[in-house]
Each structure stands twice: as structure tokens, then as C-alpha cells.
Amino acid sequence: ERYRPSHVLILSGDHIYKMDYSLFASYHQEKEADVTISLLEVGTELAHQFGVAEVDEEFRILGFQEKPKEAPKTVPGDPSHVLASMGIYLFRTETLMEVLTSGDEADFGTDIIPHLLNSHRIYAYPYRQQNKIEDYIYVTLPDGERQLRLEPHTRDSAYWRDVGDLDAYWNANMDLTGVEPYFNLYGQRWPLHTYQTAAPPAKFVFATERSDGFRVGKALDSLVAPGCIVSGIVRNSVLSPNAIVRSWAQVDESVIMDSVVVGRHCKIKKAIIDKHNIIPPKTTIGYNPSEDRKRFTVTPRGIVVIPKRFFKEEE
């Protein structure tokens, strides 16, 4: 009320995506909508995880089911997919204020959207069709060379992840590690800014490779933050600031949080290790599910989760 905006954009805080909100707003205005909801196609087997919209040929929303357990409304002409809510809403301010002052309704999918369907113009925004991220990215040519090219519709234009559980969080981190990642942090036109830790550059030590191959500090297909010191091998992983991977240690497909020390000869695979863990030498994590479950949380996908300060002292 203080700023008197004509529209209000409502977002969720646990989703990862790149979205040109100006395209979203233009679509909303073209439809003369009171509310526009960004939706994406997902398989019907996932419908129970989302709010699901029923639409007509013009993408006007006719019905809305909140996490249907059976018989979800499918995409017209495609019975194997549904249109799932991304938790991104654009409201005319008048419409939003009308809802907020009319009663105790609080949940968008259960209360607010169904309440508005019969009296307001509510439209679906087909995210993967309409969202376009234009950016310079490196592409691999047929001869193997890498070239910087302006792409009018990058691959991550269609990317969206809800990281509300540990498996999804791990998946989202792994999406960053590829040579051509599913979600690109390095675009020139769409850079992602974050808090920078006051730490020195990452350091990779022991340059003379030994017969066992593991004394050399190196990270492959990985993201390594400032302050890290690596003298083991890191593959397909994300290292947060000030992490240390000691000699002969191996870290694969893992997310290592701030100030974690991975001791010598450790073997870690498919793990999320929270802050300030000092992992003793020769510790093995992620290779024996039954043993891991005795000590740690193991997700449905088999990701081992080590809580903060579980390992407190280096032996």
C-alpha cells in the first residue's frame, strides 16, 4: 500500500531458475489477466507434488488441483503430462488486496486460486515455451574446440528445480558441474551474484604425480570456492569456502560445505557434508549404504548426509 504498485510479483525462495520477468509481465498484460501463474510440464507421476492447472486452448485456467493424489488434469492432447505450478504469481494489486482482505484464506493452491477462478481472469504462463534467456555461452564444436557464441534461447531457459528436499538440493548442485552445465553460472548477460567470502584463492598442491596417482591436488568437473586447499582428487563436486581435501583423499559427486576438512585417504561419494566437519583419515562415506544408514541420514536416492560438526576432531 505504501508504494501503490499496479502489480505484485510473488515468488518462492527455494527454487532455482533463470526467468525474464519482463516477458512474464508482458504476457500477463496481453492476456488482460488479473492473475498469471507460471507453469511447466511434468510427468503425471509427479502431479501429487504440485499444484496442477486445467487450461483451455488460450491457456486460461479453468480449474486448479492442489497436489492431486489421483486423476490429475492433464495437458490438452497429452495425457502423460500435467501443468504444474512453479510458485510464481503475478497479481493485479487490486485482485491481491481483495483476496487478502476478504477472509482467512492463506494458501495459494488450496484457497486463493480456486476462490478466484469463477470471478477473475486467471491465466497460465507456459514457462518452457515463453521464457527465453539470451546469453553468451561456450559451445563445443565438432572438432572439439570451444567457442563463445550468443545463444538466443539457452538450455537453462527451461531449467527449474524445487530444492525443498535433500535429493533435489544434491541434484541442483550436480547440475552445475558439467562442462556444459544444465544451469550455467558463467553467463555474461545473466551473471549470478552472491556473497563473496573474504578468503584467499583456492589452492591445488603437490604437482609431482606419484605412482598411486592421488597425491596430486586436482579438481575435475567441479566448482571450488575461495579458501579451499586441495591435495587429493575432487570430481564432479562442489566445494564451499575454506574446505580442505588432504592428500590421497577422493571426493566424488559430493557437496562439501564451509570449513570441512577431508582427511588423508578418505573416500567420499554422493554425500552432502555440512559445515565444520573434520573427517578422520581413511573414513569411507557413500560406498556402503547399510553401514552409512547406521550412522547418518541416507536419502531415498542414496545421498549420505553428514550433519554439522558430526566429526569434531581430526585424528
Regions found by a protein language model. Give the residues of each.
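Alpha-helical scaffold elements adjacent to nucleotide-binding pockets in ATP/GTP-utilizing enzyme cores
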Residues: 23-27, 95, 112
